[in-house]
């Protein structure tokens, strides 16, 4: 959520910055609501002041033995007026809040202009895509030929966009998770967390999935209590960013506690409501997939440097797996709702002859922290400040598996196990048909 000053002090400039990322702010409506808010605020303050003065006069009248009934009647009338004004004020504040919750973050000045992914800017490429001397198969064919990916069973058990893994392919999927967690905890200073996969709506509001992206989530129906009333349900997490970041909700940290680095491996659940017909083949876009998430909570002045660091931690995994990739900075029109600046890492997939996203690393600045009231107090200061929150995939496990199956495939259909994964797979060097 944006600082309210952006909607009060220079709304035209705010509207222009939002327009650059494709969001049209209704300036007239916001301005009208702000005028109502200010008018009602003055009115409630004046009525409160009058009621306080009348209450004091009642005490003085009673002390003198005078008839205080007229004053009592006046206080009652003032109380009714004050209640009505406060009710009006609450309605206006709720309307402003509803608008504020739908406004995306302001892009950082370093973010390039642009409308969509075609305008993203490549920062670097790493590694050289391998040249194969045989016809390259995609990960679906590689995995099925190894008897390690079973898409038909996934459909039978659950439906479209679900997959069953087995044998050494399933083991490699697990090995990737363990390797990623060990790297981030042992080398990069993250604390591993085990978090709930079901979260409440307050958590989803905190990290800005709600209210805008309710249709992208899977929601559970609440249980019916003994009185026959249905309780509030939970939602399945779309990413571990939600529970990890919400660990800071309503907290005030000491400056010395920062930075806080958290990581977790979780399944992620997404409806893919806006992806009909896209990536229907294989593991690229699933309703359920695993991811190792990275989250950092930092001081405001450190957040941009931290974005570089966090992105580097995700790049480290790709480099140690020797998977060619490129790093791009997202343009204003392609950034996520809550992001001030985002880097995407895209891994090379030879069967598609292109790079595909495998990690997205974002600096959310104080956008999430304001919703969550996640704060810290500087040494010697009385008033706490909002944290800056950052998150990124380190990495998406299924897509990493896809990249290995394609980049490490051999002419006989087997797949070489990357060296860094071999200790996690009992020393296995090659996966053959099972």
Curated annotation (Swiss-Prot):
Pfam families: Seryl_tRNA_N, tRNA-synt_2b. GO terms for cellular component: cytoplasm. It catalyses: tRNA(Ser) + L-serine + ATP = L-seryl-tRNA(Ser) + AMP + diphosphate + H(+); tRNA(Sec) + L-serine + ATP = L-seryl-tRNA(Sec) + AMP + diphosphate + H(+). It is found in: Cytoplasm. Gene3D superfamilies: Bira Bifunctional Protein, Domain 2 (3.30.930.10), Serine-tRNA synthetase, tRNA binding domain (1.10.287.40). Its EC number is 6.1.1.11. Pathway: Aminoacyl-tRNA biosynthesis; selenocysteinyl-tRNA(Sec) biosynthesis; L-seryl-tRNA(Sec) from L-serine and tRNA(Sec): step 1/1. PANTHER family: SERINE--TRNA LIGASE (PTHR43697:SF1), SERYL-TRNA SYNTHETASE (PTHR43697). Belongs to the class-II aminoacyl-tRNA synthetase family. Type-1 seryl-tRNA synthetase subfamily. HAMAP family: Ser_tRNA_synth_type1. This is Serine--tRNA ligase. The lineage of its organism: Bacteria, Pseudomonadati, Pseudomonadota, Gammaproteobacteria, Alteromonadales.
